[in-house]
């Protein structure tokens, strides 16, 4: 009897464990994964991927009066992290964030326009605007992306609308390409015999975002259309599995026209960049932006509203003026942004005048030029160089880009060693505007370099990669040295042990005699010191792979890149 008691005592708990639980608990392969216990170390939600810690008040509160025309000054450039994490993406020298000391000079570069511009023109009846000869076939933000799943370039653009226009507004069309330069307009079924994919709205700006991190295939394409109903502009959020057939979801609160949306994947939030015309007095109106963010694009759209309490930024104090209308104060007409490598790239359409009534009387096109800015927190923008990134052509009478240049969502695309930027431009045919799409190209990472003969020492860094890469153009030679936190050379990684680099390469591996890898230095704190003789460096990064993938974001994508939108091994 005693033996039976002990036998039952042993087997009963085992049977309860094996058989117990709710009847509806899945079994086999459907069992939910084991949840690891929470870490003893609390997660700091304000700590970003690069070591920047966001302020407690987020988003920051800014004044729409005292800061209206002062642009922005990122806090993290004057209050740097004690250690900068460079594990994500190529590290660009667009500001002084990475630099502790240097005697090299920062040089900015600008994309070159493709000689065959424009690459997309209005040729169809549904691309005409009105009946007097105006026509429109260009993104108004909209989007140009490379879809790695299909191996195809894709463009969404605004067309004049022709007979499909609502209250004179445009429609949304789709085009595709195999090389990013030559485009076709496929005949689709949404509107029989056309390439229209969205209409029946009084549209203004729109954004089509190819969300490469989206797990729900039916929402891989997201549209944030700005359209007017009953006199009010609102975001109209739509989703699609293919970018052609769209399902309407929700609308926002009232906003203004020329508002945009983009994803900041570094923080996994959707940013609502809302135009706000701030009335200063009876004679002065300043075009500025309001800010909203939300991790859920549907909830974010529903809450989005243009309010001065959400003021973000207006023009910088040193914006360039229109040479023919020098007394007009410049303003921010639009802002788009794209995640590229380790930063957010911002594109600012800076309005330089004149107002529409003056344009009509003087028979000119209002001047918007596209400027570029950089952000490491997704909110604070740095614009040291105030020259146009995409400039109007004032010397050729029939140039496609005479005026009103606008940036495009998704740009740039990474095509080999180059970046492809798409933009819209306008010209006059008599008194009618013709709006077309252009292309500009830049060296990969080629926004700015540290140039000359001299040295550059970084701030204290940490990383989890193994292979050191640079994007550089060096006529003499470049060597790299690694230092500990006390500025002492790390054994095996001295300047003398570094194999000198010479040449022009957007992805060159740096090695040391006896040390082809930095694996032994993972997660240790160190500084990098560059010695450059007659050359320039655009970027550096430490890759987990000998192939040089950066683990950064790839903006609008490109041939051969990972479908995730991250530069990692396929």
Regions found by a protein language model. Name each.
Residues 15-39:
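Bacterial Sec-dependent N-terminal signal peptides
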Residues 31-570:
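Carbohydrate-active catalytic/glycan-binding domains of CAZyme proteins
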Residues 6-7, 26:
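General helical structural elements
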């Amino acid at each position: 009897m005693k033996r039976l008691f002990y036998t039952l005592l042993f087997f009963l708990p085992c049977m309860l464990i094996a058989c117990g639980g709710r009847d509806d608990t899945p079994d086999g392969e459907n069992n939910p994964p084991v949840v690891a216990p929470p870490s003893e170390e609390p997660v700091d939600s304000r700590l970003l991927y690069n070591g920047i810690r966001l302020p407690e008040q987020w988003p920051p509160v800014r004044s729409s009066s005292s800061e209206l025309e002062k642009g922005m000054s990122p806090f993290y450039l004057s209050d740097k992290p004690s250690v900068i994490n460079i594990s994500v993406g190529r590290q660009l020298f667009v500001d002084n964030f990475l630099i502790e000391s240097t005697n090299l000079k920062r040089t900015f570069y600008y994309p070159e326009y493709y000689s065959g511009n424009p690459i997309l023109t209005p040729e169809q009846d549904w691309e005409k605007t009105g009946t007097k000869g105006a026509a429109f076939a260009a993104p108004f933000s909209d989007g140009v992306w490379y879809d790695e799943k299909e191996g195809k370039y894709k463009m969404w653009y605004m067309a004049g609308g022709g007979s499909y226009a609502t209250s004179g507004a445009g429609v949304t069309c789709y085009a595709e390409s195999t090389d990013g330069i030559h485009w076709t307009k496929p005949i689709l079924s949404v509107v029989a015999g056309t390439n229209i994919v969205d209409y029946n709205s009084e549209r203004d700006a729109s954004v089509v975002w190819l969300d490469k991190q989206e797990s729900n295939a039916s929402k891989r394409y997201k549209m944030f259309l700005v359209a007017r109903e009953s006199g009010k502009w609102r975001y109209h959020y739509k989703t699609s599995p293919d970018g052609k057939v769209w399902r309407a979801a929700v609308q926002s609160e009232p906003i203004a026209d020329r508002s945009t949306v983009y994803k900041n994947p570094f923080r996994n939030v959707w940013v609502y960049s809302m135009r706000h015309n701030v009335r200063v007095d009876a004679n002065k109106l300043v075009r500025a932006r309001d800010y909203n963010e939300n991790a859920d694009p549907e909830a974010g759209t529903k809450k989005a509203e243009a309010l001065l309490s959400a003021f973000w930024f207006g023009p910088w104090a040193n914006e360039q003026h229109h040479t023919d209308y020098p007394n007009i104060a410049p303003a921010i007409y639009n802002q788009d942004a794209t995640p590229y490598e380790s930063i957010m790239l911002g594109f600012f359409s800076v309005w330089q005048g004149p107002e529409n009534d003056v344009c009509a009387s003087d028979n000119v096109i209002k001047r918007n030029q596209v400027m570029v800015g950089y952000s490491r927190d997704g909110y604070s923008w740095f614009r040291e160089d105030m020259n146009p990134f995409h400039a109007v052509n004032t010397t050729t009478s029939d140039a496609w880009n005479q005026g009103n240049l606008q940036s495009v969502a998704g740009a740039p695309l990474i095509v080999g060693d180059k970046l492809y930027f798409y933009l819209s431009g306008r010209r006059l045919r008599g008194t009618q505007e013709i709006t077309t799409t252009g292309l500009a190209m830049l060296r990969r990472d080629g926004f700015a370099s540290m140039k000359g003969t001299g040295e550059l020492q970084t701030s204290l860094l940490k990383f989890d990669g193994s292979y050191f890469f640079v994007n550089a153009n060096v006529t003499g030679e470049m060597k790299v040295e690694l230092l500990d936190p006390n500025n002492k050379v790390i054994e095996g990684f001295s300047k003398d042990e570094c194999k000198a680099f010479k040449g022009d390469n957007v992805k060159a591996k740096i090695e040391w005699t006896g040390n082809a890898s930095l694996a032994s230095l993972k997660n240790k704190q160190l500084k990098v010191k560059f010695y450059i003789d007659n050359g320039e460096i655009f970027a550096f990064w430490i890759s987990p792979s000998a192939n040089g993938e950066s683990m950064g974001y790839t903006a609008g994508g490109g041939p051969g890149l990972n479908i995730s939108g991250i530069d990692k091994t396929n």
